């Protein structure tokens, strides 16, 4: 942890070298989800409900997903840009260092500008929690926390898959963005509105529904089964096959010679 904090300090100092550029980039990141949220707002000006969900419930859903994604994107950016590390030979240096490869890639890049999305998500989450009639109890508080943390782990797993694919393609594959940016965009609404097929895929293949749809149903009072609180914890198991795929890629890595 001490070494990680040292890396974080280095990245902060690097970002602060050009403060105006950093603040403008963070501001731009703030407006990206804001425009998406306006789209949701305009739709609810025309339709009062979507698949039985109100504006505040959808806003709560979007805020939780956006916060998870923004934190994962901020701290796991090294895996999202891993194809560059492969291409320029930087990963060769990682392999000869006496630290775990995942840890070193994790520390290689942190896009602190992405905290702009996180700020927007926090404001939206506070507003949604104030306006959504939730019958609060300890289990629902833990559900909210687990949804955010589980979402971070889930997005981190997808980034690991992306990085693992880079060992075999040498370049990133754009289709993986369906599982990162796509999950963030689809996360604006509860997954049930996309149909049974999507909900099934996001339950058993990529367990996105376990950190979004099912615990959300308990959080907003659609049912009172407190076991839904544990679903985001179960979804965290997804990181295990993702890590194994990454290790498989490391074992088959061949240097580019750069």
Model segments located where?
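Hydrophobic transmembrane alpha-helices and immediately adjacent juxtamembrane helices
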Residues: 1-258
């Amino acid at each position: 942890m001490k070494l990680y904090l040292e890396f974080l300090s280095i990245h902060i100092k690097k970002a602060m070298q050009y403060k105006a550029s950093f603040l403008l980039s963070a501001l731009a990141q703030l407006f990206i989800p804001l425009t998406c949220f306006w789209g949701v707002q305009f739709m609810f000006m025309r339709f009062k409900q979507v698949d039985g969900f109100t504006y505040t419930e959808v806003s709560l859903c979007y805020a939780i997903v956006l916060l998870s994604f923004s934190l994962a994107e901020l701290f796991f950016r090294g895996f999202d840009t891993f194809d560059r590390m492969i291409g320029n030979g930087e990963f060769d240096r990682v392999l000869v260092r006496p630290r775990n490869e995942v840890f070193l890639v994790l520390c290689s890049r942190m896009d602190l500008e992405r905290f702009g999305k996180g700020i927007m998500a926090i404001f939206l989450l506070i507003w949604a929690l104030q306006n959504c009639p939730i019958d609060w109890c300890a289990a629902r508080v833990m559900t909210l926390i687990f949804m955010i943390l589980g979402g971070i782990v889930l997005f981190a797993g997808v980034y690991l898959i992306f990085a693992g694919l880079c060992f075999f393609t040498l370049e990133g594959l754009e289709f993986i963005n369906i599982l990162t940016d796509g999950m963030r965009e689809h996360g604006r609404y509860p997954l049930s509105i996309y149909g049974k097929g999507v909900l099934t895929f996001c339950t058993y293949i990529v367990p996105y529904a376990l950190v979004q749809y099912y615990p959300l149903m308990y959080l907003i009072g659609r049912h009172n089964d407190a076991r839904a609180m544990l679903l985001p914890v179960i979804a965290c198991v997804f990181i295990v096959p993702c890590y194994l795929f990454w290790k498989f890629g490391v074992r088959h890595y061949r240097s580019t010679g750069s």
